[in-house]
Amino acid sequence: MLKEIIAGIEEEGLNYRFVKIYRTSDVCFVAHDAAELSGSGVGIGIQSKGTTVIHQKDLFPLSNLELFSQAPLIDLPTFRAIGKNAAKYAKNESPAPVPVKNDQMARPKYQAIAALLHIKETEYADRNKKPQELKIEFK
C-alpha cells in the first residue's frame, strides 16, 4: 500500500516523507496534521483499517479534499492513484477522479474487524505526544 502511494507521488515528480501522528486516531485530523507538517500543504492520512484521506492545510479538519472510506475495497492501483492525486493537489493541478468500488456487503463483512482496529489504534493516541518523522525501509 505505501509503495503504491509513493509510486503515485514520485510519478508526479514530488518527494514524500512519513510522519506518525499520535494525538488522535481520527483520519481526517491525522491527514490535516500531515498537511500542516508538509512543505506543500497537502497530506495523506491513513488509518490502520485502511481508510485514507487527502487533506490540505488551509481547510477545516473535517473538510478534506478526498476521502476513501471503502477500505477493504481499496486495491493497490487505487492507492497509487491516491498518491498521484495528492501530488497533483500539491502542484496546484486538477487531479482525475479516483475510481472507487462499491460493495454493499463490505461494510457488514468487515465492520467488526474495522471497529476492533480503530479501538486498538485509539488506545495508542496520546494528545501530548508530538508527531514523529519515520524512516521506512522496504525489503
Show the residue positions of the predicted features.
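Glycine-rich phosphate/diphosphate-binding loop of Rossmann-like nucleotide-binding domains
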Residues: 1-13, 17
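Conserved active-site and cofactor/substrate-binding residues in soluble primary-metabolism enzymes
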Residues: 4, 25-29, 39, 74-85, ...
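Short coil/turn connectors at secondary-structure junctions
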Residues: 14, 38-41, 133-134
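N-terminal glycine-rich FAD/FM-binding segment characteristic of electron-transfer flavoproteins
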Residues: 19, 30, 137-139
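Short beta->alpha junction loops
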Residues: 19-25
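Glycine-rich phosphate-binding loop
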Residues: 25-60
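Ser/Thr/Gly-rich flexible loops in soluble cytosolic domains mediating phosphotransfer, phosphorylation
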Residues: 61-101
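Internal, active-site/partner-interface "lid" segment
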Residues: 93-138
